[in-house]
Swiss-Prot record:
InterPro entries: Ribosomal_eL21, Ribosomal_eL21_arc, Ribosomal_eL21_CS, Ribosomal_eL21_sf, Translation_prot_SH3-like_sf
Organism for this UniProt entry: Pyrococcus furiosus (strain ATCC 43587 / DSM 3638 / JCM 8422 / Vc1)
Name listed for the protein in its UniProt record: Large ribosomal subunit protein eL21
Oligomeric and partner information: Part of the 50S ribosomal subunit.
Any one GO molecular function term: structural constituent of ribosome
Domain of life of the organism encoding this protein: Archaea
Region (Disordered): 1-25
GO terms of biological process kind: translation
GO CC, alphabetical: ribonucleoprotein complex; ribosome
HAMAP family: Ribosomal_eL21
Comp. bias regions, Basic residues: 1-24
Keyword list, A-Z: Ribonucleoprotein, Ribosomal protein
Stored Gene3D superfamilies: Ribosomal protein L21
Family: Belongs to the eukaryotic ribosomal protein eL21 family.
């Protein structure tokens, strides 16, 4: 028997794939977007940019911006009863409307 893979992108065939017309990098405005401390954001992973990518299990979650570290934002999300801190590049974040 072969050993099961435990890689970062396992079980993400649909989650981290793009439509053929949407291939390539997103527009620059997505890279340069700014967020305020306390603002609510959605975590939507951009599969073509790997830096600052959160774990795929957090895709679709909503969190609160707590601060900034370099280019990345510090986002807190609630996972059950725990509060988890993630460091996410702004290309993987969308503001909540």
């Amino acid at each position: 028997m072969v050993q099961k893979a435990h890689s970062f992108r396992r079980k993400t065939r649909k989650k981290l794939s793009k439509h053929p017309r949407r291939r390539g990098l997103p527009p620059l405005t997505r890279f340069l977007q700014e967020f305020e401390v306390g603002q609510r954001v959605h975590i939507v992973i951009e599969p073509s940019y790997h830096k600052g990518m959160p774990d795929p299990r957090f895709h679709g979650r909503t969190g609160t911006v707590v601060g900034k570290r370099g280019e990345a934002y510090i986002v807190e999300i609630k996972d059950g009863s725990k509060v988890k801190t993630l460091f996410i590049h702004p290309v993987h974040l969308r503001p909540q409307k």
